[in-house]
Amino acid sequence: MLVSLGGVLLCLSEMRKGNLKRLRFVFLALFATWLIGRLLFPAAIQAFVVKPNERERERPFLVHNIIFTRYAYNLDKVRIRYHPGEPMPSVSELKFHRTALANIRLWDIDQLLDAFSQLQSLHLQYGFSAVDYDRYYIGGRLRQVAIAPRELFLPNQIATWVNRHLHYTHGYGIVMSLVTEFTGEGSPSFIIKDIPPQVAEIFPYRIRRPEIYFGEFVLPEERRRRQPFVRGRQQQQPAQPQTSPTQTGQGTQSQSNQPPPPPTPEDQQPQATQTSQYTIADFVLVRTRAPEFDYPLRGELGRGEGDEGHSGWKETRYEADAGVPIGSWWRRLLFAARFMDLGLLLNTDITPESRLLMYRRILERVNAVAPFLLIDRDPYPVITSDGRIVWIVDTFTATTNFPYSTPISPQIRVNYLRNAVKVTVDAYTGEMRFYAFDPQDPMLKTYMKAFPTLFRNREEMPPDIKAHIRYPQSLFAVQATMMCLYHMTNPDQFYLKEDAWEIAQEQSGVEGKPVPIRPYYTVIRSPDDGRDRFMLLIPFTPYGKPDKNMVAWMAAHCDYDRYGDLFVYKFPPGKLVDGPQQIEARINADAQISQYFSLWNQQGSRVIRGSLLILPVGNSLLYVEPVYLQAEQTPLPEIKRVIVSAGKRVVMGEDLWDALTQLFQTPIHDGILTPNQQFHRRTPTTGHPSPVANPEAVMELLRHLQDAKQAREQGDWLRFGEALNKAFEQAEKLERAFGVAR
C-alpha cells in the first residue's frame, strides 16, 4: 500500500518535471513490486514454508475458523449425545412410543400437493401453492397434519381487468389431512375439506374467517424451483446447502456438489404476475359497487335472494379496515401512476368507501417493511382459536462479513445466520407482527434500537400461535451441512477430516435415484426429556460413503418451551447401524416387493417410492417408506403399500399397522396392541408365587428406573438406554407372573 502510494506520488512529481525517461523506470519498479509482492513471494512462501509444514502453519487459522463458524451458525450450542443404536425395538418400546407411531408421516409433500390439487381445488380459479406440516391436538391427541390454503389463481382466459381487481379478490378455506392415514382408495384422510369448509367434529376449532386476501400466491411454474430464502434489497440469497464437506480453513470455503440456484432478481415493486395459464393480481379493490365473489355455489345459477351469489357465486363484502382508502380522485390518480394502470381512473365501480389492497404476497409484504431481514420461502398457515387463518413467516439476520466464518457456498457469501424474528401475517387483514425470538443476537439488537416500535417480545405471541411455531427447515439444512465438518473441534482432526460426515441419501420418486434426504418434521418421544414433541430430524453417514452405516442423526426442537434446542445423537464407536441406502438396497433385494413393483409398473401406472423416514424408537431405529401408485394419465397419487424395516427385516403391508404387525409378529394398531388383544388379568396358577408378592422383584424394577433417571440427568444416554431396557424386561416378567396375557 505504502509502495503504491509512494509510486503514485513519484509519478506525479516526474510528470510535472517532464522527465519521461525516469517515469518509465518508476512504472517498471511498480510492476516489479506488484509481481514479486502479489505473485512470486506468496507462491514461494506457500511452496517452501507452508506446504512442508501445512498442518502446523494452518493450525491457528483452523482454530479461528472452527470457533467462529460454529458461533456464526449456532453450532456451538449443539449438544452431543449418544444413541445406543440397538437393531430392533421391543414391543414395550413401541407402547412407550405409541404417539410417535401414530404420527409417522406417510404423505410426502409432492404427492400431497398433487392429491390436494386433484381432489380439493374444486373450481377453475383455485389452487394450492404448497403443503406444510404442522401439529394440532385432535380428539385430545397430538396429531401431525398436512395443511394447505386454497388460494386464487385466475386463468388467463377470464383475467379481465374487472375480474382481476374487483370480482376475484381472494382465496377461500383450508385443506387439512392426517399425515399417517389414508382412505380405502389410498387418498388423503381429510380433517378439513370442501367449500364452505367442512370441519371434522374432533377438530377443536371452526374456521370463521376463511377468506385469504394475503397469501403465498406461488404460480404452478414456480413451485418446483423455489429456493430456501428471499433476500432484501441489500442481501444475497443463500443457495441450497451442499451435502458434502470439503477442506475448510482460513481463506477457503466449503464447496457444493450441486449447481448454484438460479439468481433471484432484486427486490422490486409488486406487479401483476402472468404466465401462459394464470394471472395473480398485484392489487385488488374492495368495497366497490361490483360484487366480490366469495365462493361458487353448487347447483345454483343466477342471482339468488339476499347475497346468495352472482352467476353461481356467493357474494361478500370486505369488512376490515385494512388497505388504502382510494375514494378520492387525487388518490386514484396517484395510484394509477404508481401501478401504471388507467383502470383505477376510469372504472366507475369505485366509491368513496373503496379500499386498495396491495403487497398481497406475504413475502413481498414482509420484505417491504423489513428489507434488512432474510426471509424464509416456506411460510405456513395456522388456524387460530377464534377461527382465523394466520401465516407464520421465519426471517433471519444475516451478514457476509463475519470474520473467519465459512460462507454457505462459494457463490453465496453469507456466513452468519440467525432465526432471530418470526412474523405473523393475518390472511384477511394483512396485519403483520414481528416477534423477536433471539433478542441476544447482536444484529437484531441493532435493528431493535433503530426500529423500537417494530419488534415485540416473543412472550407477547398469542398462545394459539405459539403452539404452532416450527424450526425452519432452511436454517436446519444449513446447520446440518456445516455440522458435517464442524462437529470436529480438534484442529488436527479437522485438518485430516478423520470423522467427516455427509447428509444421508435415499432413493425416492419414480426413477429411484439417490438424493440427499431433506430435513423432515415428525412427532417423536424426545430422548432428552421423554415427552412427545414435534421435531426436525436429519441423518448422517460417513463422508464419501453414502451407502454405508449411519454415524449420527441431528434433531431440532420446535415446541415453544424448547424452541431452537439442537442435538446430535452419535452411535457408539464400532456400532453398525444401517444407513438409508442399505435399507433401500434391502428393499430392492426383496423378491416379493420387487415382484409387486414390476406388476404395478406394467398396468398403465407407475410406482413412486416415498421418502424414507428414520425414526428413533427407544434404543433402536425404525425405517418407514410409503409406496404410491399413480396412473400415467392422471396425476393423482394413491398410497398402495407401506414398507417398514428394523433389524435385518423388511416387510411390506397394506398400511402402517399391517406392516408393523408383520415386523413384530404382534397385532399392533395406532401404536399399541389392537383392542381385541389388550391386556387382561387371569388368576395366577397356584403353587407358583407371583413376583408381586415378592418385594425384591418390585424393588429391582424401581432400581432400574432410578438408574435410568440418574443417567438421563447426567446426560449418559448409553447407560440410560441400558437401564431402560432392563426396566422393560423386568416389567414384562412382572406382567407374566401377575397373570397379564397379551
What are the residue ranges of the model-derived segments?
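Soluble extracytoplasmic regions of secretory-pathway and membrane proteins
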Residues: M1-Q714, L718-V740
